[in-house]
């Protein structure tokens, strides 16, 4: 999807947008399942820490059981939506579409290296100024948008053989992406158990849900405070790479 987005300007517009939507819908089928898997992994981490503490930390048993139930239900829903034969047919059709070279008529004769350089320059400039569009690093919805664009840029750098590699830039990019991913997972974990916190009839469940939601809160808050410096370091490395290679 990231590569398709990268080459979108030189592809036939209507069919490219249609394929972007199709691939996005396929990816979204498993998004809820991934969120539940991350939440259950958090339960495992809490259990390990509880064991190491000698029983001083409460294990969120009820929260884990409810999350497991939700995962079973979501798995069944995914198996209904993600029919293997349909997905295989879709990917085969996508492959055929690519082999037919669906280039936009006015760009079909352009040199690929020139296009890649210009496109990377465009994406780099947008990344360097994205904090003006999303200035609040405490806003998780804005951070999610930044994370998507960071991830897309990293995939482009690592996928295209024509792109000059820079280990310093990739290292800073990966660190920033991991930090944003951790903050997103912490935010989603808290949202997943919000309904448990509102269960007035189950005091133990509310307690466990509060423990679960706040388990890595201090770490998340510290990460948010580190983001401006991480962002500045990344932008500095990106600017240097862009000037040297584009």
Stretch-by-stretch model annotation:
Residues 1-246:
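Cationic, histidine-enriched alpha-helical/coil surfaces that engage anionic ligands
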């Amino acid at each position: 999807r990231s590569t398709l987005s990268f080459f979108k300007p030189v592809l036939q517009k209507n069919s490219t947008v249609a394929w972007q939507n199709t691939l996005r819908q396929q990816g979204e089928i498993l998004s809820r399942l991934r969120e539940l898997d991350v939440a259950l992994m958090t339960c495992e981490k809490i259990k390990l820490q509880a064991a190491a503490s000698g029983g001083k930390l409460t294990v969120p048993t009820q929260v884990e059981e409810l999350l497991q139930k939700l995962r079973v239900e979501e798995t069944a829903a995914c198996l209904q939506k993600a029919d293997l034969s349909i997905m295989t047919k879709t990917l085969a059709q996508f492959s055929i579409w690519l082999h037919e070279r669906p280039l936009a008529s006015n760009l079909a004769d352009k040199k690929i290296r020139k296009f890649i350089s210009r496109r990377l320059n465009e994406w780099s400039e947008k990344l360097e100024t994205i904090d003006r569009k999303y200035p609040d690093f405490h806003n998780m919805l804005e951070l999610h948008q930044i994370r998507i664009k960071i991830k897309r840029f990293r995939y482009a750098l690592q996928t295209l053989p024509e792109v000059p590699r820079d280990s310093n830039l990739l290292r800073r990019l990966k660190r920033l992406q991991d930090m944003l991913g951790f903050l997103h997972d912490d935010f989603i974990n808290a949202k997943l158990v919000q309904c448990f916190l509102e269960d007035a009839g189950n005091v133990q469940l509310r307690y466990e849900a509060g423990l679960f939601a706040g388990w890595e809160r201090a770490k998340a808050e510290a990460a948010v405070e580190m983001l401006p410096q991480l962002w500045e370091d990344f932008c500095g490395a990106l600017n240097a790479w862009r000037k040297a290679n584009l």
